[in-house]
Curated annotation (Swiss-Prot):
The gene is dnaJ. The J domain is necessary and sufficient to stimulate DnaK ATPase activity. Zinc center 1 plays an important role in the autonomous, DnaK-independent chaperone activity of DnaJ. Zinc center 2 is essential for interaction with DnaK and for DnaJ activity. This is Chaperone protein DnaJ. It is found in: Cytoplasm. It comes from Buchnera aphidicola subsp. Acyrthosiphon pisum (strain APS). GO terms for biological process: chaperone cofactor-dependent protein refolding; DNA replication; protein refolding; response to heat. Coiled coil: none annotated. PANTHER family: CHAPERONE PROTEIN DNAJ, DNAJ HOMOLOG 1, MITOCHONDRIAL-RELATED.
Length: 377
């Protein structure tokens, strides 16, 4: 049975360039791949045709021979092996890897593997978070070996190219009608072999050590904010780029202030005479004390805003506010004279339902009375 023309199989003209061949192959291989057509013998046969056509046309020498002699150019020299290892078919593996990813072509060389990122948890006080601070930290890490400068070899020597993968770090294995790409078992994907390792790092190119860094904390950071320090993570393998260091911020609980966004909150206790008659008190801020006027007849829970005494925004440098919540404190440990004065004051209110002096109390008890009246109807 006559074989079908390779150009027709891929649906391309005989003048097609390399990029057109790859594009056509990617489209057809994705459509007819056995993993997408399980149990479909027709699709399996079609995929074999597509693969065979691609391997011939993507190779300049084979394509030239095919253009001159057709299928006869390969009838005597074609391999019947169903399992063969080869290392010089990069074009096919690259295109196959583009289509099917890590399953068939995802194990790339490990020669330039970036170092791992590190995370450091830093606790700071609220004052430090608001004003900013510079702190020194010590972190365990892997650093580039100072003896071999990351090469892993003894001074004056170099790694030799792996003879199995010819320095590529990967090999390709043909199994039946498809090809599998995997890391080279000899060099473990590095592409090179160290025969004379460095005495300090023993061929690893990196050594375990502690690194001391000075970290600048800008004003305005809050819990769960992170600072990224580029290239301060672990050194990369084989002299590759270092990873990054992330400093995770946790702000300690403050005994007076609570933070919400860029605003600070605090509770300020006042006695009931101050609440009733008004006056002036001093309240704390992170920059010192400030005076706060309490108007007469102030109720417990009222919020007073002191502008510009909060936290500066780390984004736009706008300053938040300090909000003071007044808590009216009931007096305790009263002496007889004080108790008598309070009794006298209470009598002057004409009872606790006084409409004029305690409007909230009157509204409450009027509501209670209506509630019970409704129950007894």
């Amino acid at each position: 049975m006559a074989k079908k023309d390779y150009y027709q199989i891929l649906g391309i003209p005989k003048s097609a360039e390399e990029r057109e061949i790859k594009k056509a192959y990617k489209k057809l291989a994705m459509k007819y791949h056995p993993d997408r057509n399980q149990g479909d013998k027709t699709a399996e046969g079609k995929f074999k045709e597509i693969k065979e056509a691609y391997e011939i046309l993507i190779n300049e020498e084979k394509r030239s021979a095919y253009d001159q002699y057709g299928h006869a150019a390969f009838e005597n020299g074609q391999s019947n092996s169903t399992y063969s290892t080869f290392t010089n078919s990069a074009d096919f593996s690259d295109i196959f890897g583009d289509v099917f990813g890590d399953i068939f072509g995802g194990n790339r060389t490990q020669r330039a593997k970036k170092g791992a990122d590190l995370c450091y948890n830093m606790e700071i006080t609220l004052e430090e978070a608001v004003k900013g601070i510079k702190k020194e930290i010590q972190i365990p890490t892997l650093q580039k070996c100072k003896t071999c400068y990351g090469s892993g070899t003894r001074t004056g020597t170099k790694p030799r190219s792996c003879s199995t993968c010819h320095g590529k770090g990967q090999i390709h294995i043909r199994k039946g009608f498809f090809t599998v790409q995997q890391s080279c078992p000899t060099c473990h994907g590095k592409g090179t072999i160290i025969t004379d390792p460095c005495n300090l790092c023993h061929g690893q190119g990196r050594v375990e050590t502690y690194k001391i860094l000075s970290v600048k904390i800008p004003p305005g950071l809050d819990t769960n904010d992170r600072i990224r320090l580029n290239n301060e993570g672990e050194a990369g393998a084989n002299g590759a780029q270092s990873g990054d260091l992330y400093v995770q911020i946790t702000v300690k609980k403050h005994p007076i202030f609570e933070r919400e966004g860029n605003n600070l909150y605090c509770e300020v206790p006042i006695n009931f005479t101050m609440a009733a008659l008004g006056g002036e008190i001093e309240v704390p801020t992170l920059d010192g004390r400030v005076k706060l006027k309490i108007p007469y007849e102030t109720q417990s829970g009222k919020l007073f805003r002191i502008r510009g005494r909060g936290v500066k925004s780390v984004q736009n440098r706008n300053q938040g506010d300090l909000l003071c919540r007044v808590v009216v404190e009931t007096p305790v440990n009263l002496n007889e004279q004080q108790k008598n004065l309070l009794h006298e004051l209470g009598n002057s209110f004409h009872g606790f339902r006084g409409e004029k002096n305690s409007p909230r109390s009157k509204r409450f008890f009027d509501g209670v009375k209506r509630f019970f009246d409704d129950l007894t109807r």
